[in-house]
Amino acid sequence: MRRIGLCISLLVTVLVMSACESEGEAQMFADCDQKTVKQTAAKPMSSKKKQDFQALASDRQLAIVFSSMIQVSEAFDYGIGNPEYFVRISMTEEEADIAKENLESIKLENKSLKKQNSEAVALLQKTRNQDMSRIEIQQLTENRAGFFETADSMIKLINQVTPKNAKKTRQQLDQLKKQYTQYSAESIKIMNSIVKKQKADKASFERHLEALLQKQPGQQVRSELY
């Protein structure tokens, strides 16, 4: 599928720094962590579930939080990238309609995706070593707010595209896309900084994150060092 692409390709390149040692190990981590994700990020946590999350090691806590954020970013990549591809400097009425039709999915998911991100941020503030990365957590919170503001601006532009304003819309989208990818790249650096500041076990964090991302359909996991 066509999409903006930089967000997830960069996120996965940086965060998934090494492949799992074996397929069986990946499955073991995935099954365990997916259960925790459902207990924490999917709905408001009870006191017991908060205690369960807070009892986890830093590497698992951060893997859960960041995998949830990556999932949100990927949804916006697809949801905006596909319709954005169809916006050209010259368009027919039919082509404008196609772009708008491709936008429907992200318009419907927008609210729930932002809620998922908010829940991930809330979890990040509950991580066991959050005091060691307060500045970075605030930076990431502000970064995500900027990311969503830019995404919303792109959605609004695409939703209003017509043959008459196609050229101007295309130019505006090109500028916003630069901002979008800048926010994505910056979020990667901040996430890496949080992992380091919280002194999480790097190898274990990578395995847990890899396992969680492998459970997300269609997610290409890359193994490269940042």
UniProtKB/Swiss-Prot annotation:
Name of the coding gene: yxiP
Keywords: Signal
Top-rank lineage group of the source organism: Bacteria
UniProt protein name: Uncharacterized protein YxiP
Leader sequence segment: 1-18
